[in-house]
Amino acid sequence: MAVSRSPVRRATSGWSTVTAALAVVVLVSGCGGETGGADGGTDPGSPPTGDPATGPGGGRNLTCGRSSFPPDATFYQDISGAALDPESHAIMAALDARNWGDPGDRQTLGIDFSFAVNCATTSVALRSYTQDGDNQPDCDLAPVPLPLGGKTEGSNDYACSGGDCHLLVYQATRLYELYQANVAGGLPTGGAFTGTCLAIWDLTRDYWGPTNHSPNYSRGDACDGGTAADLPIAPMLLTAEEVAAAVAGDGIIHHALRFTMTNNRLRSTGYVHPATHFAFGGTTGGADTLPTGARLRLRGDYNLAGLPSDAARVVARTLQHYGMYLVDGGNIYLSATTDAAAALNNAAVGALRPRDFEMVGGGRRIGQRDYECERTPVTN
């Protein structure tokens, strides 16, 4: 659903080209587990009893057998008591008056179950890709692991037939996120490997801490990436494993979620940290709309009893404690892995309206032309 491309580009003379063979490995797609339990047995407004699993931020964000990013990463911070953004009341009132979307667009908060997280062992060799478009120096140019049996967003393999086709791969201490990835014909006999923009994330690095400042904040202010906000996708996805663990445990997934927004409800210029880029090309929202990078929190007084399942209440309780980041334009959806559809459905949180949310105070506001992306792309 991305509409992101940087408004400022600097051309380069060519791309990095590295060739390597692919190795056969076991793929864990979605890194999923058991699904959530049935309704009943607990007070739907209170977290179920039980010990939470350990993990970053006191939670359970363990993907491909390891944690993603240091525990003080922005999406692991509990913001249930955080101050509101000064614009919160005006923006949320304006959004509520118009609803999540216009007639003809989606008008209720849904869940997009099209994402897949691919787990590559260190024995998987890397394969070079050819970049489509002129997205430099924003995008990384290093080769990418492609485990056999893997797939991109919205596909059953690595062949992209249209859409965003995000490729998400964990390998060792790196997370590779490639926008519009395509292996012609898929693997193992596929042809050319292409993609529009690659963001490589170092899982040991704190990109958003207090010592990080513009223009070198995160991967660089004004720098595009795998999604408009240039925030990592995989750590903020809903997964079946997390939902099941939360239903059986403390009732909360201990990280922020990500969501996309109808284009005319998304501010057309500027962004707020931790985002480092804004949705561009199709977004038309004015000053009373949400900026890219906004973090919304479900109101603490929202009555969870009316939600349809324990799994839906897990999502809502997570939104009360960790919120959801606005990462791109397109339509009004939370993002989830395909396996999470066994525990939830598209309408699980459809009762949540704009009036039920608040905009939490974020980081620095960045204007459309405050910076030009300045970074050295990763090439190996």
Regions found by a protein language model. Give the residues of each.
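N-terminal export and membrane-targeting signals
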Residues: S6-V18
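Bacterial N-terminal signal peptides
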Residues: T17-S29
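Ser/Thr-rich, Pro/Gly/Ala-heavy low-complexity intrinsically disordered linkers and tails
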Residues: M1, S6-R9, V28-G58
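Short, surface-exposed polybasic-aromatic patches that bind anionic ligands, especially phosphate groups
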Residues: G50, G55-N380
